[in-house]
């Protein structure tokens, strides 16, 4: 495996993962893992660890950008994050007891469908609409849906970015930018926990691949987050939808190759 091949694969993986994270709060694991497994022959468990470590800084820089533009609900984000982290552990414990199924494809298919939804039925909720929900109700919803997301993340082994975006926009009635900002904020911590546990269990990764993935994903996530915060809602819905459809289709293609 030449260094040039490694650079090209990690660059393309970083572009896809970064755009997905910055525009839609998508977990980098959905894009990076299949590419590393398919083209660089990296062992699946390690590929997920590298993808999650790429997620940490990309999500953090995206969350910072959304926060700077006042598109982040920190209070409810923190409540949801605690539920997600706690029940991810429960989910992964139960997943060990149940026969393993390849449910990773489920999250990729969901990414594709969510992309179609944003193009066909854009989320046009405004910040004013969000004020109609009481703080208490919002907090309770954050706990309940955090538990559901965490359990599914642990059980399926997915980052949960798409699930969070779907629930925040459709069930909790968040405006799109605030939903993405809150999703990447939560994902910074879930990805960090996941990356640390992967490397603790599976050993150190290929540092060259890991470093390149982290840097490329970070750069493209920053670019996408800046563009997303400047866009008007309709354009953002369309851009987010197109990014998700393309990434979903590409990853399904990689899975077929693998």
Residue ranges and their predicted role:
Residues 126-127, 158-163, 174-178:
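Short, structured loop/turn "capping" segments at alpha-beta junctions
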Residues 54, 182-198, 208-221:
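A small-residue-rich subset of transmembrane alpha-helices
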Residues 1-19, 33-39, 44, 65-151, ...:
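Juxtamembrane transmembrane-helix boundary motif
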Residues 1-6, 10, 53-64, 158-168:
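Hydrophobic, membrane-facing alpha-helical anchors
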Residues 42-50, 75-76, 173-184:
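Membrane-interface alpha-helices at helix entry/exit sites of multi-pass transporters
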Residues 18, 48-56, 180-191, 244:
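Transmembrane helix-bundle signature of multi-pass membrane transporters/permeases
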Residues 53-61, 86-90, 94, 186-193:
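Membrane-embedded alpha-helical segments of transport systems
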Residues 23-32, 157-167:
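Transmembrane helix boundary and interhelical junction motifs in multipass membrane proteins
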């Amino acid at each position: 495996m030449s260094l040039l091949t490694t650079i090209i694969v990690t660059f393309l993986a970083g572009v896809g993962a970064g755009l997905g994270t910055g525009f839609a709060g998508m977990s980098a694991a959905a894009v990076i893992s299949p590419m590393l497994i398919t083209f660089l022959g990296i062992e699946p468990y390690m590929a997920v660890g590298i993808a999650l470590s790429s997620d940490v800084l990309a999500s953090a820089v995206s969350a910072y950008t959304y926060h700077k533009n006042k598109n982040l609900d920190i209070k409810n984000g923190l409540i949801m994050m605690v539920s997600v982290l706690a029940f991810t552990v429960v989910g992964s414990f139960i997943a060990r007891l149940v026969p393993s199924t390849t449910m990773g494809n489920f999250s990729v298919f969901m990414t594709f469908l969510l992309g179609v939804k944003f193009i066909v039925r854009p989320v046009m909720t405004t910040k004013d609409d969000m004020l109609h929900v009481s703080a208490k109700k919002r907090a309770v919803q954050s706990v309940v849906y955090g538990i559901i997301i965490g359990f599914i993340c642990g059980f399926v082994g997915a980052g949960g970015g798409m699930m969070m975006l779907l629930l925040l926009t459709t069930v909790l009635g968040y405006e799109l930018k605030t939903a993405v900002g809150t999703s990447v904020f939560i994902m910074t911590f879930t990805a960090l926990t996941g990356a640390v546990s992967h490397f603790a269990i599976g050993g150190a990764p290929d540092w060259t691949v890991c470093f390149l993935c982290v840097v490329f994903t970070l750069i493209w996530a920053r670019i996408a987050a800046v563009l997303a915060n400047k866009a008007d809602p309709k354009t953002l819905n369309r851009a987010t939808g197109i990014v998700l459809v393309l990434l979903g289709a590409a990853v399904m293609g990689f899975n077929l190759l693998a």
